[in-house]
Amino acid sequence: MRLYQLSPQSLQFPDPNHALDNPNGLLAVGGDLSVARLKVAYRQGIFPWFSPGEPILWWSPNPRAVLLPGELHLSRSMKKFLKRHTFHATLNQAFDDVIHACAQEHHDGTWITPDIISAYRQLHQVGKAHSVEVWHNGALVGGLYGIEQGRLFCGESMFSRMDNASKYALLAFQQHFIRHGGHLIDCQVLNSHTASLGVSEIPRVRFLQQLSQWQDIAVEEGCWLPQQLAEPAF
């Protein structure tokens, strides 16, 4: 396998199955973060991920971390918390605030650079990127953002300023997404936090099959309208 250099004159990506094994999933370098290129990338299960000072790097890891419908795991302490919490969640009410908060959450080595923020703001403006906000006494205390691909949602990052706020965001969003016909949440790479929530890994080839099957089927009308999300059931 080799690392591919993207042409600035073409939006074409190599086959994601040609990504490197080490580092896992690295596929290509270069190109830009235009809306057009990002749309092409996500249709093929490819996403940008790079640190400040690095060129744009494009990834498609194997295996792929995903959250299947109904598999979000709630610990005993989380269930206890849900019985007495004072949070409420909204959708697409404060995208800019959420992505900036996610960047601050990972400030020691954030990949959410100013260029990434600008690119995903543009994706939000054209209806491809969406945010979930969690509020406590009028203050933004948690949330997440990602990209819709039909009945798949590609989660990008989350943040939490209070205990359980990001978990609450994911729970409220997952149930909303499923009610509107959502099928799968892509979490990209498994880590200890997402694993504790019930995220699992599937082979890249299976993920790409799921992506192909569901990305051109729209969720039900009203899914992405700015709104308050229903209280999660558990």
From Swiss-Prot:
GO terms for biological process: protein catabolic process. It comes from Pectobacterium atrosepticum (strain SCRI 1043 / ATCC BAA-672) (Erwinia carotovora subsp. atroseptica). This is Leucyl/phenylalanyl-tRNA--protein transferase. It is found in: Cytoplasm. GO terms for cellular component: cytoplasm. Functions in the N-end rule pathway of protein degradation where it conjugates Leu, Phe and, less efficiently, Met from aminoacyl-tRNAs to the N-termini of proteins containing an N-terminal arginine or lysine. GO terms for molecular function: leucyl-tRNA--protein transferase activity. InterPro entries: Acyl_CoA_acyltransferase (IPR016181), Leu/Phe-tRNA_Trfase (IPR004616), Leu/Phe-tRNA_Trfase_C (IPR042203), Leu/Phe-tRNA_Trfase_N (IPR042221). HAMAP family: Leu_Phe_trans (MF_00688).
